[in-house]
């Protein structure tokens, strides 16, 4: 097996269970809307994202397609695949999901792609140079220090993540292509916050910090030393646990659409949102989707109270209004515990 310097096993990561769960849930159901990971550097954020990509199932793609279109999903084909399909069956190959990184200084053109206006005006052709959102289609889009990006760029990313389509318009010329991806943003709150309107559009949010447990800190150093000395041996030592999680994710992706969501669970989610005084209804939708994904991951056929309890904090943490010191207000953990405990 060819290994690169980023392929540290997912199951070898010590601690950070909430972060790992948030990533897995988005892999099972990308409509959750991505995850924002807040915390200091050196806490395994990028390592976990790259390790997750190795666990996800291979994809069928149209060979030669810039956007990695799925051959069996013509409604989501790009213009090139539609045109090629008129001349016969499309060639098919497989690929693994990969992590596409957004450079911190990326321009809007680099993100969305560029249209050759000269060719459009002179020849009537639509020559398009794909951007990061094209590379990200059916992959993981990793945005480090998302809080340092221009707000407009963040808006563009979140729009594409929500719609599954990237549309570029220049001088009356328009090009659209599929752009469905798992969005993972990271930030250090000490370097600046995101506007609440942008925070709300991330499906899940988790806070990570350096591990304080003595034994776990020692284990991190020991594991890293073994990994750096012989990565192939280290990976083989974790091959069984990696395969178990890989199979669990693949099964959950397949069964997720069949997981039922009882009305009483929807009422519980709504009660939590009301008690926390959360604006809008996005939190209810995300919580329902995340709880369904957790149920599928647990091989359960129906969402239960425990599934809501396990995902609620990562759904609501970034959506609860901050309250001035001494003024009181809803406490996230207390509200969730109280609501779940009454069921």
Predicted regions and their residues:
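Charged, low-complexity terminal tails
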Residues: 1-2, 327
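Conserved AAA+ ATPase core "coupling" helix
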Residues: 108-113, 194-253
């Amino acid at each position: 097996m060819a290994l690169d310097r980023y392929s540290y096993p997912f199951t070898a990561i010590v601690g950070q269970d909430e972060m790992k769960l948030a990533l897995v849930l988005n892999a099972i159901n990308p409509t959750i809307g991505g995850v924002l990971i807040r915390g200091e550097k050196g806490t395994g954020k990028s390592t976990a994202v790259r390790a997750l990509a190795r666990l996800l199932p291979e994809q069928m793609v149209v060979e030669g397609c810039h956007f990695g279109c799925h051959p069996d999903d013509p409604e989501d084909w790009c213009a090139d695949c539609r045109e090629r399909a008129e001349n016969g069956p499309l060639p098919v190959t497989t690929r693994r999901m990969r992590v596409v990184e957004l450079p911190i200084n990326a321009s809007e053109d680099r993100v969305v792609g560029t249209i050759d206006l000269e060719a459009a005006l002179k020849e009537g052709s639509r020559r398009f140079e794909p951007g990061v959102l094209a590379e990200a289609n059916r992959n993981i889009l990793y945005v480090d220090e998302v809080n340092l990006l221009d707000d407009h760029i963040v808006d563009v990313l979140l729009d594409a993540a929500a719609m599954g389509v990237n549309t570029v318009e220049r001088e009356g010329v328009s090009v659209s292509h599929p752009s469905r991806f798992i969005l993972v943003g990271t930030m250090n709150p000490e370097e600046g916050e995101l506007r609440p309107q942008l925070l709300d559009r991330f499906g899940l949010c988790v806070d990570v910090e350096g591990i304080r447990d003595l034994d776990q800190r020692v284990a991190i150093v020991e594991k890293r030393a073994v990994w750096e000395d012989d990565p192939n041996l280290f990976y083989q030592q974790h091959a069984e646990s990696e395969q178990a999680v890989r199979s669990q994710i693949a099964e959950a992706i397949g069964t997720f659409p069949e997981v039922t969501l009882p009305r009483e669970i929807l009422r519980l989610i709504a009660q939590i949102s009301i008690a926390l005084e959360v604006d809008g209804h996005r939190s209810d939708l995300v919580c329902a989707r995340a709880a369904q994904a957790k149920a599928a991951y647990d091989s359960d056929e129906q969402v239960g109270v425990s599934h809501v309890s396990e995902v609620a904090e990562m759904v609501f943490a970034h959506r609860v209004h901050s309250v001035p010191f001494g003024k009181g207000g809803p406490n996230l953990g207390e509200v969730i515990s109280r609501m779940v405990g009454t069921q």
